[in-house]
């Protein structure tokens, strides 16, 4: 995973959405990432880490910019630092989401939005 992160260090956010995929500027080229491959996105200051099934990509962007680009694409903001893909959620317990070995906290301000986006029986 570290090799993938080093290879895809991003100089600038430059995200463009095209239906089922997004392009991010990695080094001096644009890299296509399929939206269905994104598990979650984590904010780290002015940088965002996009976690996919193949690895992770670091970009210079804000959570607000990414959330706007991915709105309506099966992603929901669950914390001020996390945006998750709904179909990658394995379970929700108390105040966190389980996605494989990763546990992501659910912020109080985002819990209602998450609940409304789930297909509850």
Where are these regions (language model features)?
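Conserved binding/recognition cores within well-folded domains
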Residues: 2-103
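C-terminal structural segments of small proteins and small subunits
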Residues: 98, 105-108, 112
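C-terminal output/interaction extensions
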Residues: 113-121
């Amino acid at each position: 995973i570290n090799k993938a992160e080093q290879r895809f260090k991003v100089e600038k956010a430059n995200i463009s959405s095209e239906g089922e995929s997004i392009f991010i500027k990695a080094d001096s080229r644009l890299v296509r990432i399929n939206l269905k491959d994104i598990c979650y996105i984590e904010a780290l200051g002015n940088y965002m880490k996009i976690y996919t099934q193949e690895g992770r990509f670091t970009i210079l962007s804000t959570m607000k910019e990414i959330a706007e680009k991915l709105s309506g694409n099966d992603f929901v903001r669950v914390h001020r630092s996390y945006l998750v893909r709904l179909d990658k959620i394995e379970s929700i317990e108390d105040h966190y989401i389980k996605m494989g070995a990763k546990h992501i906290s659910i912020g109080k301000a985002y819990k209602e939005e998450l609940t409304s986006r789930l297909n509850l029986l």
